[in-house]
């Protein structure tokens, strides 16, 4: 239990309570208007949040309280604006309050790890992100209509659909799904560029439609080229050339080889480091012909961990890291079987 977080939460709750009760005495004016129910709800939620955060097992579920804290804080803020003579903001807030609650709640749910089963966890988070995208679409559509500003409804919906699709792909293994996850950052960057272009640059080119068309098609073409290139990209390693330079000329005592192999396997499985295991295997198989040695070590040399996508969710990192560990264990098992066939009495 991390008491510092609980103490911090209690301190923050006390500071807010003290300010709300004594603001007129301290500043000569009431800035924040909150009734007893709102004060009690806000302080209780803050203390509950810090209590959940202080317990490691319950820490992820603290995010469930975020939308409630946001709504209560927003209620107090806009009630204060209403009491200070800004009713228009209060009216707008009341119209979008439901969308804000749904958006914050679903977005918070997407970060929580509910189960260790990748498929179910990915479905829960992807569904939450989809709901967050729809609520943000309606929220920005309404705000754009009320204030007469350019709408961010479609970009916000597209952003959460990108997050939902890439999060859902975490449930599946394979090159295609790994490629989908790896494109998250690029797709979000393209979305940002298109949004900035549509809102800031395109209106300035209304009298030059040819330039606008050229820019739009250039963005589409570059995006297609980048995505298709990433999908087809593969890295080939010349194992024979790598191994030939590491074949030792002297035999090493068997006990030392076992120790080096065990250390190399542990370093690779737990940390993903190939070097200790590669060197140990090359030394152990010093009498094996280079082509055969290259074939044995090919799975290790060509192995690459699946990279974590940018802005990855905590549960998503856990799934990918666990999957990488299982893949490394399979590589070690495969190599060990080959070594046992090549080296007589290898398994003592």
Curated annotation (Swiss-Prot):
Sorted UniProt keywords: Cell membrane, Membrane, Transmembrane, Transmembrane helix
Membrane topology: Multi-pass membrane protein
Major subcellular location class: membrane
Cell compartment(s), UniProt: Cell membrane
Presence of the UniProt keyword RNA-binding in the record: no
Annotated Gene Ontology cellular component terms: plasma membrane
Stretches that traverse the bilayer: 5-22, 37-56, 63-85, 90-112, 119-141, 151-173, 186-201
Protein name (record): Uncharacterized protein AF_2401
């Amino acid at each position: 239990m991390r008491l510092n977080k609980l103490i911090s939460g209690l301190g923050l709750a006390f500071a807010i309570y003290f300010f709300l009760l004594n603001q007129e005495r301290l500043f000569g004016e009431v800035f924040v208007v909150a009734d007893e129910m709102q004060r009690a709800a806000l302080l209780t939620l803050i203390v509950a949040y810090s209590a959940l955060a202080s317990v490691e097992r319950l820490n992820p579920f603290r995010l469930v309280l975020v939308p409630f804290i946001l709504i209560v804080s927003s209620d107090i803020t806009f009630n204060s604006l209403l009491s200070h003579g800004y009713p228009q903001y209060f009216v707008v807030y009341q119209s979008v309050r439901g969308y804000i609650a749904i958006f914050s709640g679903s977005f918070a749910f997407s970060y929580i790890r509910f189960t260790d089963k990748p498929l179910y966890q990915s479905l829960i988070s992807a569904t939450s992100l989809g709901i967050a995208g729809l609520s943000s679409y309606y929220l920005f559509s309404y705000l754009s209509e009320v204030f007469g500003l350019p709408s961010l409804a479609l970009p916000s919906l597209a952003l959460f659909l990108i997050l939902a699709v890439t999060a859902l792909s975490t449930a599946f293994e394979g090159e295609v799904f790994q490629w989908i996850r790896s494109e998250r950052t690029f797709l979000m960057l393209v979305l940002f560029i298109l949004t900035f272009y549509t809102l800031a640059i395109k209106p300035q080119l209304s009298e030059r439609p040819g330039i606008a068309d050229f820019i739009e098609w250039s963005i589409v073409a570059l995006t297609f080229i980048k995505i298709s290139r990433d999908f087809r990209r593969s890295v080939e390693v010349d194992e024979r050339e790598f191994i030939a330079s590491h074949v030792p000329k002297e035999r090493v005592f068997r006990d030392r080889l076992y120790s080096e192999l065990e250390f190399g396997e542990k370093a690779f499985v737990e940390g993903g480091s190939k070097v200790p295991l590669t060197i140990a295997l090359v030394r152990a198989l010093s009498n094996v012909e280079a082509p055969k040695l290259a074939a044995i070590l090919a799975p290790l040399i060509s192995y690459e961990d699946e990279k974590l996508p940018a802005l990855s969710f905590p549960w998503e990192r856990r799934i990918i890291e666990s999957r990488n560990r299982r893949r490394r264990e399979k590589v070690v098992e495969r190599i060990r079987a080959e070594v046992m066939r090549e080296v007589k009495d290898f398994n003592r």
